[in-house]
């Protein structure tokens, strides 16, 4: 089944700004999040589709590649394999992207026809990490175990058996590319024997089987900064896959996903919560306590408060990564109707209702206004 256009998935224009793309992603991710749609396979599929679209369009290089070549330009299945459970950023258009960006992701740095082994930068890796809202707000240090490729200790990354060394490729004479002519046309292609490295290995290393790298699990320290938001990435330089022929290692990108909170809903640096209050407090007013990420806070509910009223507590939200002050906490009160009343309680409420009726409409102005608008339906 053909993939949908990434801009169509997020519902944005092709010239949408980074902020518009991020806003659209947040809205759709919240709508289709599996925690909000348990057991809903359609929602799960939409969530994955939205996440994939945002990963591509939020990265300037991948967005440029997608704009020019479509899905083929960013399809990881057409490039080198990354570590298990990770998304590699390499692609099958190294020569084309090398001209556009100077160096292909996970590919070789081109040298303007210069002979010699091609130097390859290691592929970038991606690691998804779930954290709580409290951890996102306050920040913390943690460790992650990352399955990755590392340079082989036996051959020191050369891929050759100890005591031997890679030799210059006889097909391309070490340039990593060959030129094929057909009629008036001449095309330069990656060497089929050495695959662009400029060398080949007569006697491969028995430990890594000539790859020059082996898979192992690394433990890395990760510092989660206070105020980080859902979908943001932390870059760990040099902790991606190792380079080839002395090339630099790629980077590791830790993508943050914040778990749904039982009380709060985040909107940027602001927090929202729904809070039930007794109908007596709503009618008479009073002081109530609310939870915040920093502890308890209190505010006064004025008498006559209606259900759905929103109260703003300044500075009780989250201090974002780029903010000098914290956001606000919005408390949406819901007036709770008492249930399972005893007979004495029922009698008291009936007496109260009678007193309200005798007092006229001044006690229930909204009811009077509503009945005035609909009385024609009952005539």
From Swiss-Prot:
GO terms for biological process: chaperone cofactor-dependent protein refolding; DNA replication; protein refolding; response to heat. The keyword Repeat applies. SMART domains: DnaJ (SM00271). A zinc finger (CR-type) spans 139-217. Keywords: Chaperone, Cytoplasm, DNA replication, Metal-binding, Repeat, Stress response, Zinc, Zinc-finger. It comes from the Bacteria. Residues 5-70 form the J domain. CXXCXGXG motif repeats lie at residues 152-159, 169-176, 191-198, 205-212. Zn(2+) 2 binds at residues 169, 172, 191, 194. SUPFAM superfamilies: Chaperone J-domain (SSF46565), DnaJ/Hsp40 cysteine-rich domain (SSF57938), HSP40/DnaJ peptide-binding domain (SSF49493). One of its GO terms (molecular function) is zinc ion binding. Gene3D superfamilies: DnaJ domain, Heat shock protein DnaJ, cysteine-rich domain, Urease metallochaperone UreE, N-terminal domain. The keyword Metal-binding applies. InterPro entries: DnaJ, DnaJ_C, DnaJ_domain, DnaJ_domain_CS, HSP40/DnaJ_pept-bd, HSP_DnaJ_Cys-rich_dom, HSP_DnaJ_Cys-rich_dom_sf, J_dom_sf. Binds 2 Zn(2+) ions per monomer. One of its GO terms (cellular component) is cytoplasm. Its cofactor is Zn(2+). It is found in: Cytoplasm. Zn(2+) 1 binds at residues 152, 155, 205, 208. Pfam families: DnaJ, DnaJ_C, DnaJ_CXXCXGXG. Belongs to the DnaJ family. The J domain is necessary and sufficient to stimulate DnaK ATPase activity. Zinc center 1 plays an important role in the autonomous, DnaK-independent chaperone activity of DnaJ. Zinc center 2 is essential for interaction with DnaK and for DnaJ activity. Homodimer. Participates actively in the response to hyperosmotic and heat shock by preventing the aggregation of stress-denatured proteins and by disaggregating proteins, also in an autonomous, DnaK-independent fashion. Unfolded proteins bind initially to DnaJ; upon interaction with the DnaJ-bound protein, DnaK hydrolyzes its bound ATP, resulting in the formation of a stable complex. GrpE releases ADP from DnaK; ATP binding to DnaK triggers the release of the substrate protein, thus completing the reaction cycle. NCBIfam families: DnaJ_bact, PRK10767.1. This is Chaperone protein DnaJ. It comes from Paraburkholderia phytofirmans (strain DSM 17436 / LMG 22146 / PsJN) (Burkholderia phytofirmans).
């Amino acid at each position: 089944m053909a993939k949908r256009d990434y801009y169509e998935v997020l519902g944005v224009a092709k010239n949408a700004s980074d902020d518009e793309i991020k806003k659209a992603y947040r809205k759709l991710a919240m709508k289709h999040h599996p925690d909000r749609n348990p057991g809903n396979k359609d929602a799960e599929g939409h969530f994955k589709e939205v996440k994939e679209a945002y990963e591509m369009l939020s990265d300037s290089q991948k967005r440029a590649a997608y704009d020019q070549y479509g899905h083929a330009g960013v399809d990881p299945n057409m490039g080198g394999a990354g570590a298990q459970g990770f998304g590699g950023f390499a692609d099958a258009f190294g020569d084309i992207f090398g001209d556009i960006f100077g160096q292909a992701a996970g590919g070789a740095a081109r040298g303007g026809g210069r002979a010699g082994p091609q130097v390859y930068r290691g592929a970038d890796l991606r690691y998804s990490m779930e954290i709580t809202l409290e951890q996102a707000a306050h920040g913390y240090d943690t460790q992650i175990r990352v399955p990755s490729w590392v340079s082989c200790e036996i051959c020191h990354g050369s891929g050759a058996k100890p005591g031997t060394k890679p030799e210059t490729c006889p097909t391309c004479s070490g340039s990593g590319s060959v030129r094929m002519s057909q009629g008036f046309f001449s095309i330069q292609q990656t060497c089929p024997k050495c695959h662009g490295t400029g060398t080949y290995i007569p006697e491969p290393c028995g430990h890594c089987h000539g790859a020059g790298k082996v898979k192992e699990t690394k433990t890395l320290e990760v510092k989660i900064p206070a105020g980080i938001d859902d979908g943001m990435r932390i870059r760990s330089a040099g902790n991606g896959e190792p380079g080839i022929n002395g090339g630099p290692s790629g980077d590791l990108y830790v993508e943050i996903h914040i778990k749904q909170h039982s009380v709060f809903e985040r909107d940027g640096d602001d927090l929202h919560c729904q809070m039930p209050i007794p109908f007596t407090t709503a009618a008479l007013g009073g002081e109530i306590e609310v939870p915040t990420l920093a502890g308890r806070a209190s505010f006064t509910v004025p008498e006559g408060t209606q259900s759905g009223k929103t109260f703003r507590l300044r500075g009780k939200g989250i201090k974002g990564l780029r903010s000098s002050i914290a956001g606000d906490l919005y408390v949406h009160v819901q007036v709770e109707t008492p249930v399972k009343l005893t007979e004495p309680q029922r009698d008291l409420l009936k007496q109260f209702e009678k007193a309200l009726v005798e007092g006229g409409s001044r006690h229930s102005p909204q009811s009077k206004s509503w009945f005035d608008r609909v009385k024609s339906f009952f005539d």
